[in-house]
Amino acid sequence: MTKYVILLAVLAFALHCDAKRFTRCGLVQELRRLGFDETLMSNWVCLVENESGRFTDKIGKVNKNGSRDYGLFQINDKYWCSKGTTPGKDCNVTCNQLLTDDISVAATCAKKIYKRHKFDAWYGWKNHCQHGLPDISDC
């Protein structure tokens, strides 16, 4: 039993070490590469900074409804991603696919959420970005 606990601890540490934290300008460059609308770029950066702290592997605390949020964009598993190994829900992805350093899958899902709900789908944006956005002019 002790061997399994140690193994799990080592694996958890190894997985966390692989996580990426974007710099603000690094995030802007990656979002541009993935085709995000330049006129909304400050909003996306603000959202990511307030939802995940720019960490690709962020898993949020359990929400009141029992759901969780995953990845850079903190995408919710109640509607958008499947907790299992089979892709599903509205983005047709697993939640683990949203936790990788390659954010292309997460970005596609985030764009889908935005198309349907705008930024109102994210509390991080609603609570922190409506009245002030980060300056990304140097990026």
UniProtKB/Swiss-Prot annotation:
This is Lysozyme. It holds the Pfam family Lys. Residues 1-19 form the signal peptide. Its EC number is 3.2.1.17. The active site is at E51, D69. Lysozymes have primarily a bacteriolytic function; those in tissues and body fluids are associated with the monocyte-macrophage system and enhance the activity of immunoagents. It catalyses: Hydrolysis of (1->4)-beta-linkages between N-acetylmuramic acid and N-acetyl-D-glucosamine residues in a peptidoglycan and between N-acetyl-D-glucosamine residues in chitodextrins. Disulfide bonds join C25-C139, C46-C129, C81-C95, C91-C109. Gene3D superfamilies: 1.10.530.10. Belongs to the glycosyl hydrolase 22 family. GO terms for biological process: defense response to bacterium; killing of cells of another organism. One of its GO terms (molecular function) is lysozyme activity. Residues 20-139 form the C-type lysozyme domain. Keywords: Antimicrobial, Bacteriolytic enzyme, Disulfide bond, Glycosidase, Hydrolase, Signal. SMART domains: LYZ1.
